[in-house]
Amino acid sequence: MEYARKIGTKIKLYSELVMFSHTLFSLPFAIISMIWAAEGVPSWHVMLWGLIALVAARNGANAFNRVVDQSFDAMNPRTAHRHLPKRLLASKEVLWFVVVNYAIFIFAAGMLNTLCFILSPAAIFLISSYSYTKRFTYLSHLYLGFTIASAPIGAWFAVTGQFAFTPFILGTIVMLWIAGFDIIYGSQDIEFDRNHGLWSIPSIFGLKNGLRIAAVLHSIMVLLLIALIPIRQLGWIYVVGVIVSIVLLLTEHKIIKPSSRKVMKIASYNLNQVISMVILISAMCDYFLL
C-alpha cells in the first residue's frame, strides 16, 4: 500500500512538472491535422502511436526545460515553488525521465512511418533547443510557438508520410497563437528578465509594445484561421468556431493585468485552452456533420 502511494505521488509530481494539462495547446490541432490528412478517422495504429509520440515529445521537452531553467526558476519568486528549485525531484532523475521519453518518441515515430522516424532526431533538437533561446534572443516566444507547431505538422506526416501545404498553415496558426500568449505570460517577468539578462519581447520593448505585438500575432492567426475556410472548403460550423475564438482572444487581451497572477493565468492559459477546444470541436463537427 505504501509503495503504491509513493508511485502515485511520483506520477503526480511528474505530471505537474511537465504541465500535462497544457497538452490542450497542441493536441487539438494535431487531431484536426490527422482528420484532414486521413480525410476521415485515421487508423487506430496511427492514432495510438501518434498520441504516444506527441505526449512523449512534449513530456521530454518540458522536463528538459525545467532542468535547464532551474537556476533562474529558483531566483524568480513566481517560479521558486517549482519542483526542482524546491528539490521535490532531483535533476538526474528528471534527466532520465527526459531520455526515456525521447526514446519512446523515436520508437513511436518509427512505428508510424519512415519520414517520421527520419525527422525524429531533428524534432528532438528543435523542442530541446528552445530552453536556451531566452538567453540570447527576444524571438524566443516565436521559437516556442515554432516547436509546438510541430504537433499538427508531425500529425499530418504520421498519417500520410508526405509533405503538404495545409499542415504548415495549421502549424503557423499554432506558432503565432502560442507566441502571442507567451508574450502576454512573459509580461509578468519584465523586471526579472532585465535584471538577469534574459530576453523577451516585453523586457526589450516594454509592456505596452509587447502587448501590441501579441495582438498583431493573434490578428494574423485569425486571418489564417479564416484563410482555411476556402482552402479546406469549410462550412458554417467552423465559421462559428472561429467567431467564438475571436471573442475569446479579444477577452484575453482585454483582461490582461500583469500584477495579478490569477488574471494572467486565465488570460495566458485558461482562455487559450478553451480556444483550442472550440476550434477542435467546430472543425470536427464541420467535417463530419456537413
Residue ranges and their predicted role:
Residues M1-K12, N62-L89, I183-K208, I255-M264:
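Cytosolic, membrane-interface loops and tails of multi-pass inner-membrane proteins
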Residues I7-E16, R82-L170, L250-K257:
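Intramembrane alpha-helical segments
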Residues T9, A227-L290:
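Extended hydrophobic alpha-helices typical of membrane-associated regions
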Residues V18, D69, A90, S140, ...:
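Residue-level signal for inorganic ion chemistry
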Residues L27, I106, S128-S131, P152, ...:
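Hydrophobic transmembrane alpha-helices of multi-pass small-molecule transporters
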Residues L27-S33, H83, L144-V159, I204, ...:
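Small-residue-rich segments of transmembrane alpha-helices in multi-pass membrane proteins
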Residues F29-I32, W36-V68, R78, Y102-G110, ...:
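Membrane-embedded alpha-helical segments that form the functional core of polytopic membrane enzymes
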Residues L48, I52, Q70-S120, N195-V240, ...:
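Multi-pass membrane catalytic core of lipid/isoprenoid biosynthesis enzymes
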